[in-house]
């Protein structure tokens, strides 16, 4: 019997995310990708609806890990505050269920190593956001490197039973 994976993310009532899988947002610069991701994460923090996005993370998968590979610490802090405001949560308190890391200064290999380490040590992560998936690669035009990265995302999503939502910025 095939077991249907738990649905955890919806937009306008249509499923966009399940545990054990991954998805992506793509678009050109300034096309509101990060704003939409902010609404998704805010919905996941509330386990409710924010704007047109809805989320339900099971009790044992309530933690959200947000990885940004491109922006400065200042801009990442602004994104984190926006997420908390959208969720109706205080912006001046640390949360156990929301971890935001900035990997701008790291190499692609080090970024993957850090994310893997965090997932290994945080079994309650239900949603991983990677804002800037391209920065986990050296050469975006390399078929073998692209395949390796997709395989890594598949291993992480199924192995840790979480949903990975990536952001790919188009030029």
Predicted regions and their residues:
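The Walker A/P-loop phosphate-binding site
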Residues: 1-83, 166
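Residue-level signal for alpha-helix termini/capping positions
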Residues: 46, 119-120, 158
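Conserved inter-motif catalytic segment of the P-loop NTP-binding fold
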Residues: 58-144, 148
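Active-site-proximal loop/turn and secondary-structure-junction residues that shape catalytic pockets
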Residues: 134, 170-171
């Amino acid at each position: 019997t095939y077991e249907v994976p738990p649905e955890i993310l919806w937009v306008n009532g249509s499923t966009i995310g399940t545990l054990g899988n991954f998805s992506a947002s793509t678009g050109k610069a300034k096309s509101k990708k990060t704003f939409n991701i902010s609404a998704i994460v805010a919905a996941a923090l509330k386990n409710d609806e924010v704007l047109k996005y809805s989320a339900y993370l099971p009790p044992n998968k309530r933690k959200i890990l947000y990885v940004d590979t491109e922006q400065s610490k200042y801009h990442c802090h602004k994104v984190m505050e926006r997420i908390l405001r959208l969720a109706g949560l205080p912006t001046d308190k640390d949360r156990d269920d929301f971890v935001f890391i900035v990997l701008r200064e790291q190499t692609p290999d080090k970024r993957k190593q850090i994310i893997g380490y965090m997932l290994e040590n945080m079994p309650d992560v239900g949603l991983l956001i990677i804002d800037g998936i391209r920065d986990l690669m050296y050469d975006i035009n390399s078929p073998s490197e692209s395949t390796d990265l997709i395989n890594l995302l598949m291993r992480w999503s199924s192995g840790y039973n979480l949903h990975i939502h990536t952001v790919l910025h188009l030029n």
